[in-house]
Amino acid sequence: MHRNLAVSYLICLAPLLASLTVVMPNSVVAQQELPAAEKIDFNRARELFQKRQKGEKLTDDEDAYLRKAIAARRGSDGPAPAAPAPREKTGLIPLSDMTADDRYQGEDGGLYGAGRNAPPATHENAARVELSQIRPLNAAGEPAETGRVVFISISMSNATQEFSRFKQLADADSAKSDLLTIVDCAQGGQAMAEWAPADARPWTVAEQTLARAGVTSRQVQVAWIKLANKGPRGTLKEHGRKLEQDTTAVIQNAKSRFPNLRIAYLSSRIYGGYAVNALNPEPYAYESAFVARWLIQNQVKGDAALNYSAEKGPIKAPLLLWGPYLWADGTSPRKSDQLIYTRGDLAGDGTHPSDAGRTKVARLMVDFFKTDPLSKTWFTRQALPNR
């Protein structure tokens, strides 16, 4: 195959092969109908695809196996749904503007539910306890006057585009603590499903990124996680439960990889109504906020899978809070702050932020972390305990 054609072939197949992980419910269902000898090991297929991406030559048998996996994956998933026509607004109400009486597919309003945009008192008190433990740590994770408080991002391309600009603005802001090191660990193409396996490559890349920044995994105490999966389908209950499952795994992995992680701030996507593809259009971008809320509500209710307190059993997760809520209904101003997204805030695909959009989101993030009553305790200039 001509080199250019081969490259084009891989580029076209990248989204498909990126989904070839061990956890593949649709493919598992499809394989149940195949004879045992014809079942596909999608983990092996993914390894072969990554081998080819590195420029290594596949044997004839390996190449045939990879093509067979691609065909099986296509057959189990079917064609991706088309994106709706781009539009300036949808008529959907931002979750932070919804009241306790408003309903969307049975869900009421408020970031924390019941029309509330602040955490319940018990959860806020628990958050303050966790926040009181944030202090400068050395490379071994021990308190030290010369240590660092590390704040990372975990998610996909939109997140790294936004968080990298946030880092630029925050590092230049005189309000930011000198003890805080911000590291962008989010990675293009790596949505929640890609981070969900405990041994997934994004975790290795994240640790390499930390090393390049001169810090370690034991110094990470705060994370920002942006919720999204690629090509969601179906109703909120259908695609939302998959995103909930994947993000729960991501949160657990983060706590395991970063043992001193105290707080994880969750955010949903920006407006997706200008999308020209099915990567994450509306209403999926809007609906990801409900999944973030489900996770926090699960933790508030005592879900053992998201337990953060040693008093309640094995610790599985950091404490969860809302980070900045980034969605607004296109050109329809959000009540709380008049936030809008114009077509110019999005790149050509209508899904990723443009340079102006990156800056808009980054400013929202800086404003949130330095003014929120809970986050400003570690984000802004003030004496953090060294004990």
List each model region and its residues.
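Conserved SGNH/GDSL esterase-like catalytic core that processes O-acyl groups on lipids
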Residues: 103-128, 143-244
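Bacterial N-terminal signal peptides
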Residues: 8-23
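Catalytic His-Asp segment of secreted/periplasmic serine-dependent ester chemistry enzymes
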Residues: 270-387
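Alpha-helical, heptad-rich or low-complexity scaffold/stalk segments
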Residues: 31-78
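Active-site cradle of extracellular carbohydrate-active enzymes
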Residues: 183-280, 289, 295, 299-300, ...
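Sec/Tat signal peptide C-region and signal peptidase I cleavage site
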Residues: 24-30
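N-terminal module-boundary/linker segments of secreted carbohydrate-active enzymes
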Residues: 81-152, 370, 374-387
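Sec-exported extracytoplasmic/periplasmic mature domains
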Residues: 50-57, 67-75, 167-171, 175, ...
